Amino acid sequence: MAYHTPFAAQPPVASSGLPLTLISLDDWALVTLTGADRVKYLQGQVTADIDALSADQHVLCAHCDAKGKMWSNLRLFYRGEGLAFIERRSLLDNQLSELKKYAVFSKVVIEPQPDAVLIGVAGSQAKTALAEIFTELPSTEHPVTQMGNSTLLHFSLPAERFLLVTDTEQAQQLVEKLAGRAQFNDSKQWLALDIEAGFPIIDAANSAQFIPQATNIQALNGISFTKGCYTGQEMVARAKYRGANKRALYWLAGNASRVPAAGEDLEWQLGENWRRTGTVLSAIQLNDGTVWVQAVLNNDLAADSVLRVRDDALGTLAIQPLPYSLAEDK
């Protein structure tokens, strides 16, 4: 089987019923940072403590404007001697222009890697399948491994899965090895798994709209409140220590006559009436017809609240439990 992306689209499946699946991640992009100042420069730009990031760890963090609003969130890790991050392709160009603003004063080279191949490996027996190709696999304790031109990231949520950053040659080998027993799918399958995991999806429509805590990044250990200064730090800290954040990320599931787009609002049932509320970050329809919506809503919303896609008289969406706690130490 010849390697080419994106893989043919299939309706996404929830993690509990997902067979071994290779997923082309064309809706995501890879960026690398190299040079002597790569750590120092990024430390002043993102919410995570880059000084504390080890070579066998990855972190989801935020890149904010001066008001603490996220240009993007980034899945950050070491790749070779340099740093790398993965973000949604829809906002790549704008986010990079913001990240590079002061790079001319530092010894750092920040550049997209359009030739890199990103493949998700998920579903039943994902680890066993990868073990046939890679001698060392990442784990919960050591979620990043490097082998030659390949970097493997391990995710525990919503179920064990892997993200492979590699070149075309290695991708071809993986596809050939697993072609007889794996399904293939496009980016929407990985998107569904991220929604189920409660990992915030920031696309261009929602860039510079939310502080990190409105999308639960603090609950995913993506914000350091003890590191030095970074762009937007004052507003991010205020949200924690002064209780300024009134929003949170939610996972909703139910039925809808259409899949809402990023940036749309939803409707919340109040007695006999419906009131507009929140912002959709991402949404997907599964193979069984269920619609999943990831949205930013008021963080005091009752767990039994009924919502729906805007103007969808026949649909209802219910809040689903996230696989992590939002309880915070003050």
Swiss-Prot record:
Belongs to the tRNA-modifying YgfZ family. InterPro entries: GcvT/YgfZ_C, tRNA-modifying_YgfZ, YgfZ/GcvT, YgfZ/GcvT_CS, YgfZ_barrel. Keywords: Cytoplasm, Folate-binding, tRNA processing. Folate-binding protein involved in regulating the level of ATP-DnaA and in the modification of some tRNAs. It is probably a key factor in regulatory networks that act via tRNA modification, such as initiation of chromosomal replication. Folate binds at residues 28, 190. It comes from Yersinia pseudotuberculosis serotype IB (strain PB1/+). It comes from the Bacteria. It is found in: Cytoplasm. One of its GO terms (molecular function) is folic acid binding. This is tRNA-modifying protein YgfZ. The lineage of its organism: Bacteria, Pseudomonadati, Pseudomonadota, Gammaproteobacteria, Enterobacterales. GO terms for cellular component: cytoplasm. GO terms for biological process: iron-sulfur cluster assembly; RNA modification; tRNA processing.
